[in-house]
């Protein structure tokens, strides 16, 4: 009976987080074994999320910013980054396919990520910390007064929330929210931080102003890069190696439809990204033109710098002639009607079109990665103005060692006589 009473006491402790008798703070979600042994790991957990409308490729950029913050934290304490599960993205519109709570291992190689910073999947966090509790949620926002012209100042302050919170308290005064589709997850405290500056600006606050073991930064896109384009940036970007099964699908497609293999294309790919240090221009690329043609909602806000289908095809044919290529691979989000029109104008185009079973397996994010992988290996690539999808292909080609002249190219709008081409961000080792 005494044992049963002790179990109930432990359950009560898990439900309500008072300070322990020893004076140490009790962490919600701690397991009974942790309490009994007192040997729970003291490493702290950093979680984050991004504004819901933001797409897959911008979220990959936010990961790089958060990785910089984690590296700063690791100089003082033991932290680990909890990877935010993928799901509910606007551009993932394939019907009847479950696309929520997707772990990062579906899209990226976790051992590669871990060579750069310590990372774990969200479900491992739940298992390690003893339950689906996040001690402190900080919602990042701009300053209400805005930025006044003059000297740029990096700063962070706890401020009243400007917008209505997307979190609500339950009867236990825990906070419910989206939490990547994990309905059982609760936040214990939610407050707002006004931020202006690079990601590491919040490090002192996380180290000194809160003792929370698990901290989530919501709206993390409000943080800027610590050193965009520097060695640290490229180390993190290089560590974001695509999952092997997606690379293999892309490689098989290249071989079968585009007469392209790493050996023939002089692509020096290695599984260990830390061993890949390639001289730019040393890679040749496959005997095809790679094209990323953004359509759908994108053209509404970019009517001046995105071509019509006819204008795009004229440019494609010109490039194929110039570079003596008779194959063209097209990655596009065009709706069925536009795609059929494009196919009529460019009957020789090749596209990766998964079966329903393949789509269910790889999901929209996996298909996007396969498209990018194939475009990254092309002899010459042309993308869409200010598209993060095209930006990620630029980076992938830079990592593979292709000539920048064959990488940093974009379509001009029909009315643009000459348009500014993308900036070359040179890889740094």
From Swiss-Prot:
Effect of residue 54 to A: Abolishes enzyme activity
Protein location: Endoplasmic reticulum; Golgi apparatus
Annotated positions binding GDP-beta-L-fucose: 53-57, 292-294, 371, 388-389
Tissues where this protein is expressed: Isoform A is expressed in fetal liver and peripheral blood lymphocytes. Isoform B is expressed in spleen, lung, testis, bone marrow, thymus, pancreas, prostate, fetal brain, fetal liver and fetal kidney. Isoform C is expressed in brain, heart, spleen, liver, lung, stomach, testis, placenta, skin, thymus, pancreas, mammary gland, prostate, fetal brain, fetal liver and fetal heart.
Record-listed E.C. numbers: 2.4.1.221
Site residues by UniProt (Essential for catalytic activity): 396
Glycosylation sites: 189, 209, 259
GO CC terms: endoplasmic reticulum membrane; Golgi apparatus
UniProt signal peptide: 1-21
Disulfide bonds: 161-192, 412-419
Protein's job: Catalyzes the reaction that attaches fucose through an O-glycosidic linkage to a conserved serine or threonine residue in the consensus sequence C1-X-X-S/T-C2 of thrombospondin type I repeats (TSRs) where C1 and C2 are the first and second cysteines of the repeat, respectively. O-fucosylates members of several protein families including the ADAMTS, the thrombospondin (TSP) and spondin families. Required for the proper secretion of ADAMTS family members such as ADAMTSL1 and ADAMTS13.
Record protein name field: GDP-fucose protein O-fucosyltransferase 2
Organism field: Homo sapiens (Human)
Gene name for this UniProt entry: POFUT2
């Amino acid at each position: 009976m005494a044992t049963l009473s002790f179990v109930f006491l432990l359950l009560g402790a898990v439900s309500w987080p008072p300070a322990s008798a020893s004076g140490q703070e009790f962490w919600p979600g701690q397991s009974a074994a942790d309490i009994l042994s007192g040997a729970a790991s003291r490493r702290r957990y950093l979680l984050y999320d991004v504004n819901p409308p933001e797409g897959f490729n911008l979220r990959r950029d936010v990961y790089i910013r958060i990785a910089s913050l984690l590296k700063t934290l690791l100089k003082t304490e033991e932290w680990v980054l909890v990877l935010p599960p993928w799901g509910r993205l606007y551009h993932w519109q394939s019907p009847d396919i479950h696309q929520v709570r997707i772990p990062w291992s579906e899209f990226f190689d976790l051992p590669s990520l871990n060579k750069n910073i310590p990372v774990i999947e969200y479900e491992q966090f739940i298992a390690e910390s003893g339950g689906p509790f996040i001690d402190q949620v900080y919602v990042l926002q701009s300053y209400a007064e805005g930025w006044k012209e003059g000297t740029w100042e990096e700063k962070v302050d706890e401020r009243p929330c400007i917008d209505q919170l997307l979190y609500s308290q339950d009867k236990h005064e825990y906070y419910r929210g989206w939490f990547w589709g994990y309905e059982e997850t609760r936040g214990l405290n939610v407050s707002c931080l006004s931020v202006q500056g690079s990601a590491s600006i919040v490090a002192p606050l996380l180290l000194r102003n809160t003792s929370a073991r698990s901290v989530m930064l919501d709206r993390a896109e409000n943080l800027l890069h610590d050193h965009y384009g520097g060695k640290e940036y490229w180390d993190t970007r290089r560590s974001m190696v695509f999952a092997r099964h997606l690379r293999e699908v892309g490689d098989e497609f290249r071989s079968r439809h585009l007469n392209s293999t790493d050996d023939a294309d002089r692509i020096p790919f290695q599984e260990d990204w830390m061993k890949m240090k390639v001289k730019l221009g040393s890679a040749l690329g496959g005997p095809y033109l790679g094209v990323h043609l953004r359509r759908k909602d994108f053209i509404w806000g970019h009517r001046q710098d995105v071509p019509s289908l006819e204008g795009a095809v004229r440019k494609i044919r010109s490039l194929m002639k110039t570079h003596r290529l008779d194959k063209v691979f097209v990655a596009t989000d065009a709706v069925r009607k536009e795609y059929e029109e494009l196919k009529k104008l460019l009957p020789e185009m090749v596209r990766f079109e998964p079966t329903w079973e393949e789509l269910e397996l790889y999901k929209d994010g996996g298909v996007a990665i396969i498209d990018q992988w194939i475009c990254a290996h092309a002899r010459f690539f042309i993308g869409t103005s200010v598209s993060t999808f095209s930006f990620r292909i630029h980076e992938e080609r830079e990592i593979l060692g292709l000539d920048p002249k064959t990488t940093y190219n974009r379509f001009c709008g029909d009315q643009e006589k000459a348009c500014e081409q993308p900036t070359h961000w040179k890889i740094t080792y």
